[in-house]
Amino acid sequence: MSDSDRKDWTPRAGAPLLGRIRVPGDKSVSHRAIMLAALAEGVSRIDGFLEGEDTRATAAVFQRLGVKIEAPSPQSRIVHGVGLRGLRASAEALDCGNAGTGMRLLAGVLAGQAFDSVLIGDASLSKRPMRRVTEPLALMGARIDTADGG
């Protein structure tokens, strides 16, 4: 753009802007919202939930652990929390899909439970390092076995 094509513009105060805006949900916040609601006692409503493969996988894991989760719309969830000690052992492995955030946070949640759990993921997640989570948990007394040293 040449100087002759340049136009200067100075914003000026105008009338107040009134309205509503709805921003998309956030994946990281959605994982955490599901987990915190599941560990709370009573019913929680999550609005602004980002529905995607990763967040659906995290919700499915909590359902396998005995938490009732409803989806009245793609952007909301109703979670019937069971409290810190209300999770139930799953007879099957808990599949986190490709959700690294979900798996890492679940490792911490499950380390404090009175039952053993197996977390699995897809091929991509299975290659990612987990030591930055498993080592501190082991230092706090958790018994964690990982595949292929990771």
Each model region followed by its residue ranges:
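Structural preference for solvent-exposed beta-strand-turn elements
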Residues: M1-G150
